[in-house]
């Protein structure tokens, strides 16, 4: 596992707990650092007491950002450190909604979220579920994955 440079962690651990967007140090690690540093940085920040499930002013958790970045290693590290797959951002989207939208036919993150209990039938503010979104974007492999997991809507 790559080591996060001391200056990166020092910068993340100094100063205010959240920025003007309501993002904590974990959000900013995911957004601003190289993907290779995510797992070690996540572990170190969580060990220092950073809330893995904190949400910014738009309701995004670090997990939402990791999914958007398509960082499997960050998603895995967040889930291993207690990230909640059911947190909804301001539009009612879960991390699984984001994973379906950003998947680009790579279903590894979707599979991982399902293993950690993500619900493909969570309805967002527009009445859309991850399952229905997979059908709309015509990603039959995700639809098959949901069905293979025997998750019935």
Residue positions per predicted region:
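Ankyrin repeat domain, specifically the short helix-to-loop turn at the C-terminus of the second helix
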Residues: 10-14, 43-51, 76-84, 111-119, ...
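Ankyrin repeat A-helix N-terminal signature
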Residues: 28-37, 65-71, 98-106, 133-138
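Conserved ankyrin/ankyrin-like repeat signature
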Residues: 41, 73-74, 108-109, 141-142
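Ankyrin-repeat-protein effector appendages
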Residues: 2-17, 116, 125-128, 133-153
């Amino acid at each position: 596992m790559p080591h996060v440079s001391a200056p990166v962690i020092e910068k993340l651990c100094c100063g205010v707990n959240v920025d003007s967007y309501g993002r904590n140090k974990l959000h900013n690690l995911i957004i601003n650092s190289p993907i290779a540093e995510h797992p070690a940085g996540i572990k170190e920040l969580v060990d220092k007491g950073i809330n893995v499930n904190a949400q910014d002013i738009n309701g995004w958790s670090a997990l939402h950002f990791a999914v958007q970045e398509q960082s499997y290693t960050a998603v895995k590290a967040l889930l291993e450190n207690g990230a909640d797959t059911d947190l909804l951002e301001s539009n009612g989207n879960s991390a699984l909604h984001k994973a379906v939208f950003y998947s680009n036919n790579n279903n590894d993150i979707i599979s991982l979220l399902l293993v950690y209990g993500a619900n493909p039938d969570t309805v967002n503010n527009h009445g859309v579920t991850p399952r229905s979104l997979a059908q709309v974007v015509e990603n039959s492999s995700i639809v098959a994955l949901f069905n293979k997991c025997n998750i019935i809507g």
